[in-house]
Amino acid sequence: MFAIVKTGGKQYRVEPGLKLRVEKLDAEPGATVELPVLLLGGEKTVVGTPVVEGASVVAEVLGHGRGKKILVSKFKAKVQYRRKKGHRQPYTELLIKEIRG
């Protein structure tokens, strides 16, 4: 059985036992979070409008971290204007425990 869940403005296909990196959630490591289900798949597919009523995905927060550094540059020709800035996107790592519904 699998489910499509939405968190952080993105959609993910999840199954029990899967480790997943999502946009940073406001939850402590070791806590459990419930994610809304957009679609349930398996023997019979159930599509939500927009979410499947009575269905949820239970996940455990494994920890928080920061992604790889990306560099952003600004440049304007002929005026010696150059700027370089780095960014590391924060994330939360989840372990999918079960799919209810």
Swiss-Prot record:
Keyword list, A-Z: Ribonucleoprotein, Ribosomal protein, RNA-binding, rRNA-binding
GO molecular function: rRNA binding; structural constituent of ribosome
GO cellular component: cytoplasm; ribonucleoprotein complex; ribosome
Superkingdom field: Bacteria
GO biological process: translation
HAMAP family listed in its UniProt record: Ribosomal_bL21 (MF_01363)
Assembly notes: Part of the 50S ribosomal subunit. Contacts protein L20.
Family from the record: Belongs to the bacterial ribosomal protein bL21 family.
NCBIfam families (alphabetical): L21
Cited function: This protein binds to 23S rRNA in the presence of protein L20.
Protein name: Large ribosomal subunit protein bL21
Originating species: Thermus thermophilus (strain ATCC BAA-163 / DSM 7039 / HB27)
